[in-house]
Amino acid sequence: MEECKQISILDVANRLGISFKQVSSSVYEHPEHDSFRIFSTTNTFKWFSRDIQGDVIDFVRLVKGISFKEALAFLSEEPFQKEAIQEKRERPFYYPLKRVEDSNCSLTRYYLTECRGISEEIIQKMIQQGLIAQASWKTNETVEPVNVFKSFDHRHKLQAASLQGIYKNHSLPRERLKTILKGSHGHVGISFDIGKPNRLVFCESFIDLMSYYELHQQNLFDVRLVSMEGLKRSVVAYQTLRLIAEENQKLEFLDTVIPSKLLPLMNTIRDTTSYFDNHPDLLTLAVDCDDAGKDFSDKLS
């Protein structure tokens, strides 16, 4: 399988009758879908508008509409070119707001209790785990207090942070500031453990996560609640692989996986093992029942 992954995805595309056009030194664009791109340095593709990505095996499966084993057979039978893959490593996340955090979190507590209906008990748990902070954020010449929601990885290293304004600003489309700090690693998600997790519940936002906990806390045991900060299959893949690595005491495995490989790895486990069949309650999606939520659920099924 590893040998198949070395096959040039551009060569495969050409053999399948798709002539991707070069738009930069290492990026190629589908002739009919400008959000469908191949990255020659990593030998991967991503279809941005459909949130589909992967390696050359996933590419063959998508284009030909065949199974994992059939894709491997196709790549093994044909004499394709090999590609020298340069793995792209992300830069470490830098959190610039530590000096302007307010340890009291009084405004954050007020917003979450009075505006979002979250209990003080749950807020305190999140603060104690370091998932919530209050800080000052400067936009142009304006400084305002913001809620900070923090994302930690399997080594409890800070990898991302989302900001939300506490006060309304009617000049903004959503009335409150919402942004993700530059350099955040969005594939990790924000996670909160209850007991010793053996299953995962995914929510769209951290406030959704707290609301879910508020509603279901009496029935939540040995579970990890995860905010995807959107609808991100990469977060589902990372947290699933994390749980499997924890079960097998092999967290060092996750230290070496680059984000673009997370979803293909999860798909490989799905297609080549019985793990998901043996753990039917592993994943729960607690997302909005709108078109986006339904589409996201369909892509994962």
Short names for language-model regions:
Residues 168, 207-209, 231-234:
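Short, catalytically relevant binding-site loops at active-site mouths
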Residues 90-194, 218:
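Basic, glycine-enriched DNA-binding surface that flanks or lies within the catalytic cores of DNA
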Residues 78-92:
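Intrinsically disordered, low-complexity linkers and terminal tails enriched in Pro/Gly
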Residues 196-200, 282-284:
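Short active-site oxyanion
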Residues 1-82:
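N-terminal structured subdomain of primase-like DNA metabolism proteins
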Residues 62, 209-218:
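Short active-site loop/helix that positions an aromatic residue
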Residues 47, 60, 112, 149, ...:
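Terminal peptide-recognition signature
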Residues 1-2, 45-54, 216-301:
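TOPRIM fold recognition
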